[in-house]
Design a protein with these regions (language model features):
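Glycine- (often His-adjacent) and acidic-residue-rich active-site loop
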Residues: 55-93, 134-136
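Conserved CoA-thioester-binding segment of acyl-CoA-metabolizing enzymes
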Residues: 1-54
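Hydrophobic/aromatic residues within transmembrane alpha-helices
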Residues: 16, 53, 66, 113-115
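Conserved phosphate-binding and hydrolysis motifs of nucleotide-dependent enzymes
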Residues: 19, 25, 64, 104, ...
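Acidic-histidine catalytic/liganding microenvironments
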Residues: 45, 94-95
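CoA-thioester-processing core
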Residues: 87-93, 101, 107-150
């Protein structure tokens, strides 16, 4: 099985990379589970004081939820969301700062995940987009609350 989340630890920080570049790092249920577990593991590691969160490749930080996977699930979004660990909750529980290294686009749930970070660093190609209404998904990770506080 391919590692959907890559983790590197060194010098007090943990680098977490979403690793589905061909799918624009779309957040499949398995990727969300692996990401939440990786963040929880770093919270338990006393040596890790900072997390850097990024996406593999240069096209996308993450395009948000995997819409192909959601379309194949009976019950759609809510059933899919309940079945998985919540990476945004795990990010919120981390005691140190989280740096979002946003390479490429952060769309819908990816935009929400970026807003769960304490500091965002972008590239000239970084773009943020909220397409929740277009795809019929509610912003359940706090976009409407966090965005207005920027």
């Amino acid at each position: 099985m391919k590692e959907l989340v890559l983790v590197e630890k060194a010098g007090g920080y943990g680098m977490v990379t979403l690793n589905r570049p061909k799918a624009m790092n779309a957040l499949s249920a398995e990727l969300r589970n692996q990401l939440a577990s990786a963040i929880d593991d770093m919270q338990a590691d006393e040596d890790i004081r900072v997390i850097i969160l990024t996406g593999a490749g240069d096209k996308a930080f993450t395009a948000g939820l995997d819409l192909k996977e959601m379309g194949a699930q009976q019950g759609g979004g809510p059933a899919l969301a309940i079945a998985s660990d919540d990476p945004v909750v795990a990010l919120g529980k981390f005691s140190g700062p989280i740096i979002g290294a946003i390479n490429g686009v952060a769309i819908t749930g990816g935009f929400e995940m970026a807003l769960a970070c304490d500091v965002l660093i972008g590239t000239p190609n970084t773009r943020f987009a909220d397409t929740h209404a277009r795809v019929g998904i509610l912003p359940g990770w706090g976009l409407s609350q966090k965005l207005m506080r920027l």
